[in-house]
């Protein structure tokens, strides 16, 4: 059983940090039941993911897109753009009102009899 190292994968994904993110995403997919593209050989999911990347049986671009989708909390819609513009104008109005309000005296010196 040959050990896979980061050096085996760096020519496929030049940035080591990106490689770790992509391999972790693939390992999570394998844990979730995704089909393996290489023999497991009693390796754990992260090692299998690195071997798949090294042997180019999975495409890094697809893994990157899956990673981005998994990190998005809310998927953007076309209707959301209109709401954001309305929200920005409401926020600007609230900021204008706050800036125009008189400053409150928050010192405790006059009320404190110490």
Swiss-Prot record:
- Note the superkingdom of the native organism: Bacteria
- E.C. designation(s): 2.7.7.6
One biological process term from GO is: DNA-templated transcription
Substrates-to-products reaction catalysed: RNA(n) + a ribonucleoside 5'-triphosphate = RNA(n+1) + diphosphate
Q: Top EC class per UniProt? A: transferase
**Is the keyword Zinc in the record?**
no
- Identify the keywords attached in UniProt to this record, alphabetized: DNA-directed RNA polymerase, Nucleotidyltransferase, Transcription, Transferase
The record lists its disulfide bonds as none
A Gene Ontology molecular-function term?
A: DNA-directed RNA polymerase activity
One of its Pfam families is RNA_pol_Rpb6
Cellular component, GO, one term: DNA-directed RNA polymerase complex
Key word Transferase present: yes
| Record function comment | Promotes RNA polymerase assembly. Latches the N- and C-terminal regions of the beta' subunit thereby facilitating its interaction with the beta and alpha subunits.
PANTHER family, per the entry = DNA-DIRECTED RNA POLYMERASE SUBUNIT OMEGA (PTHR34476:SF1)
Could you describe the subunit structure of this protein?
The RNAP catalytic core consists of 2 alpha, 1 beta, 1 beta' and 1 omega subunit. When a sigma factor is associated with the core the holoenzyme is formed, which can initiate transcription.
**Similarity-based family:** Belongs to the RNA polymerase subunit omega family.
This chain's protein is named DNA-directed RNA polymerase subunit omega
Instruction: Give the originating organism.
Output: Novosphingobium aromaticivorans (strain ATCC 700278 / DSM 12444 / CCUG 56034 / CIP 105152 / NBRC 16084 / F199)
């Amino acid at each position: 059983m040959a050990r896979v190292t980061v050096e085996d994968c760096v020519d496929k994904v030049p940035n080591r940090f990106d490689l770790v993110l992509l391999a972790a995403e693939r390992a999570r997919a394998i844990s979730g039941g995704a089909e393996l593209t290489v023999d497991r050989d009693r390796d754990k999911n992260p090692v299998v993911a690195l071997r798949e990347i090294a042997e180019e049986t999975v495409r890094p671009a697809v893994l990157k897109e899956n990673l981005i989708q998994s990190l998005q909390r809310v998927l953007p819609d076309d209707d959301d753009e209109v709401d954001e513009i309305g929200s920005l104008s409401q926020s600007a109005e609230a900021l204008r009102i706050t800036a125009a309000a008189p400053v409150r005296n928050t010192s405790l010196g006059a009320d404190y009899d110490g």
